[in-house]
């Protein structure tokens, strides 16, 4: 994956001009207010782009007067859609559309992490119940089944045996959407009732936090 070069300053009519930053939001939370304040303190012009009220005219030659769009949208579908449009318009986005699309697909994300040498869970993708059962035999049980796309711990399941895995996957097949025909499978990690969330910038962990819960799904505690 190639890194995206983001602008830091611009020249207009031969004179240096401040960066014009568009901040895409669903709600102005405390974090977004801090970002806007920090940008203003650095002489960056900011425009709040409210996802629910904005309209993107795809056929107009006019473009929003921004040099960079920072995605702080809560709704992934809306945020990803807006970023793709700005990307087509030649306006850089943060995160890049490539990064957003990678994070939206667990299969692609797992492949990217493995390719980058990042330690991760044993993970496999299968496309039939019989091949998924082979994964269960190799990884052992319990086996975790996740949707390819999704967040907040939704639609996660723990199969404790081959029989329960078969039943679970048969139910997924009946849901009808193409996402449920791809079986994303991970080994189960026996851990304390917690999740560790780390924030990495430039290859360095700058902060981390525990999320504690009694349920085995702890990432949304």
Model-assigned labels for residue ranges:
Residues 1-99, 103-104, 108:
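ATP-binding N-terminal substructure of ATP-dependent carboxylate-amine bond-forming enzymes
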Residues 50-52, 73, 97, 127, ...:
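Residues at the C-termini of beta-strands that transition into short coil/loop
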Residues 30, 55, 102, 132, ...:
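Flexible, glycine-rich phosphate/dinucleotide-binding loops
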Residues 56, 80, 103, 130, ...:
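Alpha-helix termini
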